[in-house]
Design a protein with these regions (language model features):
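Short, structured segments at the rim of ligand-binding sites
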Residues: 1-205
Length: 205
């Protein structure tokens, strides 16, 4: 299976490794310093992240990435200068926060309201459907998540707004539970990560 080498795609598989307790190495991923702030967030949340076989290919730094969880994830706060290099991964951070211990707060991320969808509102609406017990607060420039155990594993219908990052993020959430998700569309994923569903099925299901 061919896995994209860009970090924005690899981020979903890194999260999947952590939430499913798999340790599948991702080979030759672009690890440009401006794109890998997500790895720092995962470390702060308690994940073990390791880079191996660093090299330069076509003027881009690449490395093999392994990710695992040695203890429970913990909630964190992210704002200010950290946000620009994380903006595309914030939906995925919200998914990780659902399974963490303690509150996660994201601020200064108003740009999310002007992506393929209003990612703040759509993300929180879908989190509430996925797990009605989670505590959510919506801000104009972000949100707060207080995790709670999901006692209901019934299937859930989620609206995507045609936003590929919303879809992929909740696919990763489903891997950590027994919950089945029905999306109103999935075609938009092919624009950013062709073969995403095939990789998920082969590696994690």
């Amino acid at each position: 299976i061919d896995v994209p080498k860009d970090f924005s795609s690899a981020a979903y598989l890194i999260a999947a490794n952590i939430l499913t307790d798999k340790d599948i190495p991702l080979i030759g991923i672009g690890v440009n310093k401006t794109r890998t702030a997500f790895l720092d967030v995962l470390k702060e949340m308690g994940a073990k992240i390791e880079l191996h076989n660093d090299c330069i290919i076509s003027n881009e730094k690449r490395a093999d990435i392994t990710a695992s969880l040695k203890k429970n994830l913990k909630g964190i706060s992210i704002s200010g200068k950290k946000i620009p290099n994380l903006i595309d991964e914030i939906p995925l951070i919200a998914i990780m926060a659902m399974f963490a211990e303690g509150k996660t707060t994201i601020r200064d991320a108003k740009e999310l309201r002007y992506k393929e969808s209003d990612r703040i509102s759509l993300l929180l609406d879908n989190i509430k459907k996925f797990n009605p017990n989670i505590g959510l607060t919506e801000f104009e420039d972000g949100f707060e998540i207080i995790p709670s155990k999901n006692l209901n594993n019934d299937s859930v219908d989620l609206e995507t707004g045609g936003d590929h990052r919303i879809i992929m993020s909740f696919v990763i959430a489903a891997l950590a539970t027994d919950k089945k998700i029905n999306f109103d569309e999935t075609e938009s994923v092919e624009t950013s990560f062709p073969g995403f569903f095939e990789v998920i099925k082969a590696w994690y299901q």
